[in-house]
Structures are given as C-alpha cells and as structure tokens.
C-alpha cells in the first residue's frame, strides 16, 4: 500500500516538473514572437498590437525554484518520507489559450516551413530538371558534333579511299598498258625476227636451191658431157677394138695355132683349140671374139718346155667393159695352171664384147692353156 503511494507521489512530482518545463518553454517562446509598436512622433496614435512581456528576472526565479524543487525531490528520494498525495494544480485558462496560440503559431510556422521546403524542393527539382535538360542538350550537341565529326571523317576517309582506289586503278591501267605495249613490242620484235629469219631462210634456201640447181645443172651437163665423152670413148674403143679385131682376124689365129695347124681365120676354119673356145664356126663374130680373149690372155702366158703334153683349163668372169672380175682353175697340173693363173691375173682386162648378145654368150669363157 505504501509502495503504491510512493509511486503515485513520484508520478505527480514528475508531472509537475514536466508542466513547469512546458510553462517555462512557452514563456520563452512567447517572448520570441511578441511585437512592439513604434509610435510615430510620440503622438500615441495608431493601432495597438497586444504583446506578452516576459520578465527575465521572474523567469530566472522560476527556473531557480524549479531547480530547488528538483533538488528537494532528489533529497526526498534519498531519505524516504511518507508520501503525501498532492492535488495537481488546476490549469490556468490563459496559459491554455496561450499554449494553444503557440501551438497554432508553431503549426502555421511548420506549414510555412513545409511549404517553403516544398518550394525549395520544387525549385531544386526544376533546377535539376533544367540541369538535366541542359546536360541532355549538351550531350546531344556533343553527340551530334561527334556524329558530324565522324561523318566528316568517314566522308574524308571514303574520299581518300576512293582517290586511292582510283589512283590504284589508273596505275593498274597504266601498268597493264605498259605491259601490253611491252608485250606488243616483244611480239612485234619476235615477229620481225621470225620474218627476218624466214626471209633469210628463204633467201638461203633460194640461194641453196639456185646453187643446187646450178650444181645439178652443172653436174647434169658434166654427166652428159662425161657420158657423151664416155660414150664417144667407148665408141672409139669399140671401133679400135673392132679394128684390132678386124686386124687380128685378118692376120691372126684362134687357139694359139695357125691356119695350117688347125687355126680358124675370118674366111672359115674347121678346128680350134680349147673346150669352150677351141671349136666353132669360123664365120661367126662370136667365135672371133673368143679368139681375141684367148690371144689377149695368152700373150702373158709364160711357156715352159716342161708343160709339153699338159693342158690347164681356167674359167674367167668378164664385165661388160671387158674387165676380168674373177677366175678359177677347172683342171690341169699345178705347174702349168700356176703359169696360166698368173697370166690371167696380169691381164686384168680384155677388149669389150661388140654387142650384148656376144657378151651374154662369152661373159664366162673357159680357156685352155698349153704349149702347142
């Protein structure tokens, strides 16, 4: 019970102190907001504005009293005393009105301050928006300027590249033209060289042909002349051989004997020596040629008494001009055949046959060698 009383006493004291603080604060605030009319000319005319004048001395005394009460209350708390319930003082109507007026003024001031702060915020927001707009415009201008600079740079680069491409194209065309001209020059030089070579070759061929034709003509003429001379010589030789044959036939024999010994004459004999050339009709030219062959060879036949009673048969091969192409032993003793073969080898050539017919008949005659 006593504890409850002590708590109630403490609460009442705390409320009293709080009210005193509020009152003291209101007094100070009222002294800040009072107005004093300045009377003009000392006449005392004009409207009178009510004001509350606070005596600072009284306020100080009140403040000292409150402090004493707080100190006394603290002392009471240190030494417990019986708690006496105090009846709270009745509120003063004037103070209440004054307090309400102060509250109204504070609310008005708060609203004005709030309005001022809102206006400041509005102005700040407007300034911020204007700054943002300016910044945006500056950035847009900067971006536009950068874009224009980039465009100018791109245009300049494009122009530079176009000029470089054009220059490269012109250089390429010039280079191509130079290469084409060089190629044309080389082709012309090569063509001229080929034409010159062809012309020189044609001239050389024509010259060679002319020389060849001249040589051929000269050779043909020389051959014709040689043929004519050879023919004339052959004819002369034939005539000479024929004359010799005629002379031989007019005064010689065939087979190595005389007419009285069985040799044939141009007027007719009946017997001749040798197997192939030793017999025949004495009135035929072929037999006469056979006698000429035998006489021509036997002129070189060296006779020896030891050959008596011996016969050597030799077969010879003649060319158309009477050249002895070859010979061989058919039969006979070695001693007489050796002399016969030696005679044939030394003869080498006999008069040519007067005709092809006689040559075909006597181109391989067999001659008998003996010492009769």
Swiss-Prot record:
Changing residue 323 to A: In strain: 1479. GO terms for cellular component: plasma membrane. Residues 64-139, 166-217, 256-281 are annotated as: Disordered. It is found in: Cell inner membrane. Changing residue 306 to S: In strain: 1479. Gene3D superfamilies: 3.30.1150.10. One of its GO terms (molecular function) is toxin transmembrane transporter activity. InterPro entries: Tol-Pal_TolA (IPR014161). It is a single-pass membrane protein. Keywords: Cell cycle, Cell division, Cell inner membrane, Cell membrane, Membrane, Repeat, Transmembrane, Transmembrane helix. The keyword Plastid does not apply. Its main location: membrane. Residues 72-139, 167-176, 184-217 have a biased composition (Basic and acidic residues). Residues 1-8 are cytoplasmic. One of its GO terms (biological process) is cell division. Changing residue 249 to F: In strain: 1479. The chain crosses the membrane at residues 9-29. The keyword Cell cycle applies. Residues 30-372 are periplasmic. Belongs to the TolA family. The Tol-Pal system is composed of five core proteins: the inner membrane proteins TolA, TolQ and TolR, the periplasmic protein TolB and the outer membrane protein Pal. They form a network linking the inner and outer membranes and the peptidoglycan layer. Part of the Tol-Pal system, which plays a role in outer membrane invagination during cell division and is important for maintaining outer membrane integrity. This is Tol-Pal system protein TolA.
